[in-house]
Amino acid sequence: MNWKNCSAPCNVRLCGIHIITKSTLTTQLAIPYEFINEIRSLHPMPGSELDRLLENGWRFLGNEAVRHNVATWNSEMCGTVPVRIRLSDFTLASSQMKLLRKNTGLRVQTGPIVIDREKTALFEKHKARIRERTPDSLFSFLNVYPEVVPGEGREFSVFLGDELIACSFIHLGDKAVSATYCIFNPDYGRFSPGIYTMLLEILYSIERGSVFYYPGYVYSVPSQFDYKLNFHGSEQMNWNTGVWTPRKRVPPGMNHTQG
């Protein structure tokens, strides 16, 4: 590998996710835990603090860290489920090994995050595929100082020849890695760039000795985020207890509730 429309009232709108008011929650959605909706400003932090936030169900979104157990999907309220991969339990599925072999002709460069014109142009192509709640810019997802906030930031740029076709961004703690965001040119979907860059990030995380890789939230209903469950070693957090427990890999096309 070469390393060169929310129908319910909402009180916060965060980058395409609507956070529901408590009154709406109690009348329209029954969940077996206390309603959580927390936001805090981001700043450069020690790796141990970044680890702790991720372990407690926080995720990083632009200039803020957010933590919420309810969102909406297709105008319906649902629960959120923080997920992570315990890297000591991770193994490549046969389809993932096949993808890595298929993409050996791509060139990968990794280094500190730098947002330039090339990545901004790629983001414009990427957001064209988003049909609802289209984000304004990359900084809807990344801090204005993404190379150092909330921690050391690294990017994985994927090229076909000289063309940038995908780029993903991670932030490093002492033991944990946050998969913060990924952009790609939808014209090159045949390379499965979203899954491919996740695999690059996971392999890098293992190489650096990380313990956990955090891809963010999935929903309690089937959604576009279910690809995050397509990995061995996955765990999910219980909002009520804060305890992480293993869950089975959910291959593409399988209902996520079967995992």
Identify the residue ranges that each predicted region occupies:
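Short, Lys/Arg-enriched, disordered terminal segments
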Residues: M1-K4, G259
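Acyl-donor-binding surface of acyltransferase catalytic domains
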Residues: W3-N11, G16, T21-I31, N37-R107, ...
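Acyl-donor binding region in acyl/amide transferases
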Residues: N5, L14, T24-E55, S140-N143, ...
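A conserved beta-strand-loop-helix scaffold within acyl/acetyltransferase catalytic domains
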Residues: C6, E64-T72, S88-R190
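Active-site/acyl-donor-binding loops of N-acyltransferases
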Residues: R67-H68, T80-S88, F212-G259
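Short, low-complexity, polar/charged sequence segments that are solvent-exposed and flexible
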Residues: K102-T104, K127-I130, D187-G189, T197-L200, ...
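Glycine-rich loops and low-complexity Gly/Arg-rich segments
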Residues: V108, E132-P135, P193-Y196, L203-I206, ...
